[in-house]
A protein has these predicted regions:
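Gly/Thr-rich phosphate-binding beta-strand-loop-beta motif of the actin/hexokinase/Hsp70
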Residues: 66-93, 113
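Glycine/GP-enriched mid-protein hinge/lid loop-to-helix segment characteristic of carbohydrate kinases
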Residues: 88-126
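Nucleotide/phosphate-binding catalytic cleft detector across ATP-hydrolyzing
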Residues: 1-74, 94-107, 128-221
Length: 221
């Protein structure tokens, strides 16, 4: 009712890219635990939250546990907002020394598309239109703006993602690829994954669900 306060005790499960995990996990956890009592109002509801503990897991690797099929040997390509994390998996173990990271992820992609549209049409396209194109795939008929957007998205798959993997000496016809993260939709809709041994995990919450599952497993020990 009016004036009620939503009180909860919570555990935080969060993630870091595998390449940065060992170096940053303690400082990241300390940052999350810095303010353990939180009092705030959101959309008219007052919250009183107590953080009991926080654990840090490997980003991309967490989403892996939700992937269907035999992924005991595969290459996880986690396309997030800030980074693309490339995580080799051998016999269900993550090979940290072989992990790679790129900053040409979805935020970079959206800005690049906006710059391309402005340079060719002298007008701006909104970020929401690009995100809609990423999620829904190409629609027909296409206007002059969407034509540029679709081409940029297709080129991104070929020139940024697949070519990057080839530069790291991965044989795309022989390597099982598992695309996760919000950018997996780009590969699914514009990257012709059926031409490769590729699976696109479309649940953008897969990493978060992985953190929750891994945390619950630890709590039950």
């Amino acid at each position: 009712g009016l004036g009620d306060v939503y009180k909860r005790q919570v555990y935080i499960g969060a993630g870091l890219p595998v390449r940065w995990f060992d170096a940053q996990q303690e400082s990241f956890r300390s940052m999350l635990m810095q303010h353990r009592q939180l009092h705030f109002t959101f959309e008219g509801t007052a919250y009183d939250i107590t953080i009991l503990d926080a654990k840090i897991f490997k980003q991309g690797a967490a989403a892996y546990i939700f992937a269907a099929g035999d992924n005991s040997n595969c290459l996880i390509v986690d396309i997030g907002g800030e980074t693309i994390d490339i995580i080799p998996v051998e016999d269900r173990k993550f090979t940290k020394s072989e992990c790679k990271i790129s900053t040409n992820a979805t935020i970079w992609l959206i800005k690049m598309i906006q710059e391309k549209v402005e340079s060719e049409l002298y007008e701006r396209i909104e970020e929401r239109e690009i995100i809609k194109a990423i999620i829904e795939g190409p629609l027909h008929p296409e206007d002059e703006y969407l034509k540029i957007v679709y081409k940029c998205l297709t080129d991104y798959c070929t020139e940024q993602v697949y070519n990057m993997l080839r530069e790291y000496k991965y044989n795309l016809s022989r390597t099982r690829l598992l695309f996760v993260g919000g950018g997996a939709a780009v590969i699914k809709n514009y990257g012709s994954p059926e031409r490769y041994n590729a699976t696109c995990l479309m649940d953008i919450n897969a990493n978060a669900k992985g953190y929750e599952a891994l945390y619950l497993k630890r709590l039950k020990r």
